[in-house]
Amino acid sequence: MEIRDNNKVNLCFAFDNLRKELSRPYGILFTNNKLFLDFVSKSIQQGFKVITVGDYVSRVLEENGIIPFLEVIDGKTKRSIPQRTIVKNKEYKVTNEAGKIRFEIFEIMENILKDRDGGVVFVNGEEDLLVIPVTLSADNGDIVIYGQPNAGAVVIIVNEMIRWRVRDILEKAVVKEC
């Protein structure tokens, strides 16, 4: 593919061929809210950042007095629109199509996670797969949380092994024009 006179590369990783592989949890699956909230609280006390991907898990933490360092949300829970109660100092907006990750989002997440203030990323489209760039950019020990539909919350403790697994998934993705 040739790109001329275009400052913005409009490419995505597409994951249609990986749906089954991506449907399983890639961390600790919590089905008990008390255990989940205790684990998250202890991680924060130890100085690690909490990053949520998904409206529902973000809201569960907020309702229990835990404010994530970074929230990645699309404004929908199982495609219905929940109310936002917490307003963050820094808000970002990105576009991302369902079943894909735009190349530019990797750099955006890396820059946001380097910032001391965190914030909230509003995704025009779908945020589910943004666990991938967030996990690659988070620090060792940080926790990335996402919802596992009809099961519970999945907590990824970021380390080199999980980054290796994420890179392996990316290598299997197909690069397409967005």
Swiss-Prot record:
EC number(s) from the headed UniProt entry: 2.7.1.237
Organism domain of life: Archaea
Keyword Transferase part of the UniProt annotation: yes
Pfam family, one: DUF359
Biological processes, Gene Ontology terms: coenzyme A biosynthetic process
UniProt record similarity statement: Belongs to the GTP-dependent DPCK family.
Stored PANTHER family: GTP-DEPENDENT DEPHOSPHO-COA KINASE, UPF0218 PROTEIN TK1697
Protein name in UniProt: GTP-dependent dephospho-CoA kinase
